[in-house]
Design a protein with these regions (language model features):
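Transmembrane alpha-helical cores of Major Facilitator Superfamily
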Residues: 11-15, 85, 115-123
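A membrane-interface helix-boundary motif in multi-pass transporters
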Residues: 4, 38-44, 134-153
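C-terminal transmembrane helical hairpin of 12-TM major facilitator-type secondary transporters
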Residues: 41-97
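Multi-pass alpha-helical transporter architecture, strongest
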Residues: 60-64, 150-184
Length: 184
């Protein structure tokens, strides 16, 4: 494969994210306007984001594991890139799921909360690089077991945790303004 072709292929998942982002917010707004609670819109969005990604990455893992390197064809590459693009595209739903939760909880402190959670995510991301390399070495170079399936596993677990929490909206700023909550 030439460098120009691989460059084009590497941008496809991100283009899918941009395309889906144009659909996500209006769809979430229509769901809420149609009577779905904001909490349920957030949960649906996050479920689409994480479980969609988990399904796509599991399928990529299956294709990668069932295709020896010498048997990779153009169809194999197209299949993997399609699955990755769909998974990345579904990841755009995080913009009306998890990323909005901070604003729902406290508009006043949303930027601090988002910064804190993003910092923790960056630490986890840094550690994941180490663990991917470690798993890659102990699995004999198996990308499915060292990268795709662990990510899919954590996406499913994260979805379950997100769904289990009672997320009745609480406006902490309003409670603080009423004097029922002391400022730190």
């Amino acid at each position: 494969m030439s460098l120009s072709k691989s460059s084009f292929l590497s941008i496809l998942p991100y283009l899918a994210t941009v395309g889906m982002t144009l659909i996500v917010a209006p769809t979430a707004a229509k769901l809420e306007a149609g009577g779905m609670t904001r909490t349920n819109v957030r949960k649906l969005s996050q479920t689409l984001c994480f479980t969609g990604g988990a399904v796509c990455l599991s399928a990529v893992a299956f294709v990668v594991n069932s295709t020896p390197p010498e048997a990779v064809t153009q169809t194999t590459v197209i299949t993997i890139m399609t699955l990755l693009s769909i998974g990345f595209g579904l990841g755009a739903w995080v913009r009306t799921g998890l990323f909005c939760g901070h604003q729902d909880i406290s508009p006043k402190y949303a930027s601090i909360m988002l910064g804190t959670t993003n910092t923790l995510a960056a630490v986890a991301s840094t550690l994941s690089t180490f663990f991917t390399g470690y798993f890659f070495s102990i699995t004999g170079g198996n990308w499915a077991l060292s990268l795709f399936l662990p990510i899919a596993f954590f996406q499913v677990v994260s979805t379950l945790i997100f769904m289990m929490w009672d997320s009745t909206p609480v406006d902490f700023d309003a409670i603080q303004a009423e004097g029922k909550l002391k400022a730190a």
